[in-house]
Amino acid sequence: FVPIFTHSELQKIREKERNKGQ
């Protein structure tokens, strides 16, 4: 697996997932 996402991108995606969970 090659991390094509930057750390900031990952943070954004994670926040989106968290919002979806709520």
UniProtKB/Swiss-Prot annotation:
InterPro entries per record: Motilin_ghrelin
Residues covered by region (Disordered): 1-22
Ranges of compositional bias, category Basic and acidic residues: 9-22
Name of the coding gene: MLN
Subcellular location as annotated: Secreted
Gene Ontology MF term list: hormone activity
GO CC annotation: extracellular region
Family statement: Belongs to the motilin family.
Entry protein name: Motilin
Its job: Plays an important role in the regulation of interdigestive gastrointestinal motility and indirectly causes rhythmic contraction of duodenal and colonic smooth muscle.
UniProt entry keywords in alphabetical sequence: Hormone, Secreted
Source organism of the structure: Canis lupus familiaris (Dog)
